[in-house]
Amino acid sequence: GVSSALLVAFFHERTSPVRNGVRVWAVYRVSDAALLLAAVVLHHLTGQGDFDKLLGLGQPWPSGHAEISQQQALIVGLLLVVAAAGKSALVPFSGWLPRAMEGPTPSSAVFYGALSVHLGAFLLLRVSPILALSPVLCLVVIGLGLITAVYAALTARVQTDVKSAL
């Protein structure tokens, strides 16, 4: 979060990059809060804090360590989806992205492409046993991905700056 905000606000002499850096900071804080809250709720529900044991290292959920209901999985899963959406700049957390590309081109492209998008995807893959417990949650993830793809395509059509379109 800090690195992204500082990178976006790299040209700090102008007000626009600084304002966008604050937006990035806020989005990442919401994402971090959702991830922390999901971990706290999951620990409260299961009494387990070790993700390797909790997720059963690839064994079908629930492994022998913890059982959660479909409704509990939905609550924890929604928090995890919010965390992943914030990290990967999915809708509704993607509004800052077209304006954030005022930073240095190579570093902003590498940093965002190599880290941010992959953080959200890795998180969802890592907690996929929880997501699989709730069909509604799977539809939410698919819907967010679809809406984000359409939004990105429409945004790219009207952008005049190449970096903003990417």
Report residues per predicted region.
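Hydrophobic transmembrane alpha-helices and their helix-loop junctions in integral membrane proteins
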Residues: 2-166
